């Protein structure tokens, strides 16, 4: 009985990762499952985040459901990291292992077929099996979009209309440089797990104008929960005179942690790019 059970599981696993191909000359060759790297853009407004949830209302759930329809068995995807409910992405990256004997372009078309309009795979490529969407990433770039005027109905999902019309952008531009470098960012996180490493490095931090709105751009090797939104909220507090640059510098030294910071809403946050 145990021998049969072992053979059953052995051939089940084997069939999942190895398939039979016939080449142009009619000769057979063995084909191992390949690792596929995918880039995806999504509007996170209606999703409860990236990571799979019990109610299946996460971006990961939608993509895995599409993969099940293609391969007729469950395929787990591994993302570069999580995004929270309401957060968007232009360049989220994930990978999965599956047998696919056609061109990557055909897989791209198959993935996008019947996906909801809010999710679109923008690139598919075969990669070495040592690649990992999360652990191979060197840095991630986030953009936070905000403006000083009310948003019209066609942009309200993707930008924060800051409720302070007299916000001094020059103060934000002066304060944002405080965040560059290696710091303990626990004072700029929503919540921190007991054993979590709160020391992170931001290689660039800046604010620039794009048409009629402004963009906070952060590039770094790692982020804490709600870290970008907390930084954005702190900058707005500087811009309206509630705190000053010295306050941010002291908080990065883990002083005045008892003082609550504003958390910017999720709608303006985009995962722009994952760098490998």
Regions found by a protein language model. Give the residues of each.
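Short linear motifs in intrinsically disordered
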Residues: 9-10, 18
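Intrinsically disordered, low-complexity cationic segments
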Residues: 1-2, 30
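Structured-RNA-binding interfaces characteristic of tRNA pseudouridine synthases
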Residues: 17, 28-276
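Short terminal hydrophobic/aromatic SLiMs and anchors at protein ends
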Residues: 3, 11-14, 24
């Amino acid at each position: 009985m145990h021998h049969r059970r072992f053979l059953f599981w052995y051939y089940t696993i084997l069939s999942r990762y190895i398939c039979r191909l016939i080449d142009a000359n009619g000769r057979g060759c063995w084909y191992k499952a390949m690792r596929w790297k995918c880039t995806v853009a999504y509007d996170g407004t209606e999703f409860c985040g990236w990571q799979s949830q019990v109610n299946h209302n996460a971006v990961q759930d939608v993509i895995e459901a599409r993969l099940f329809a293609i391969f007729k068995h469950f395929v787990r995807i591994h993302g570069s990291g999580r995004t929270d409910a309401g957060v968007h992405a232009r360049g989220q990256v994930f990978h999965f292992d599956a047998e696919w004997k056609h061109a990557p372009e055909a897989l791209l078309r198959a993935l996008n077929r019947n996906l909801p309009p809010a999710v679109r795979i923008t690139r598919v490529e075969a990669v070495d099996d040592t690649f990992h969407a999360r652990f191979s990433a060197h840095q991630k770039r986030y953009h936070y979009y905000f403006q000083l005027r009310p948003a019209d109905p066609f942009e309200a999902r993707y930008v924060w209309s800051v409720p302070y019309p007299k916000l001094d952008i020059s103060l934000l531009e002066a304060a944002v440089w405080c965040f560059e470098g290696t710091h303990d960012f626990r004072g700029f996180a929503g919540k921190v797990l007991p054993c979590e490493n709160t020391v992170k490095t931001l290689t660039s931090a800046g604010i620039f104008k794009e048409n009629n709105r402004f963009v906070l751009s952060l590039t770094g090797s790692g982020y804490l929960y709600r870290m970008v939104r907390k930084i954005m909220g702190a900058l707005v507090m500087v811009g309206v005179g509630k705190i000053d640059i010295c306050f941010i510098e002291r908080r990065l030294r883990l002083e005045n942690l008892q003082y609550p910071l504003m958390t910017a809403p999720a709608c303006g946050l985009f995962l722009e790019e994952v760098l490998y």
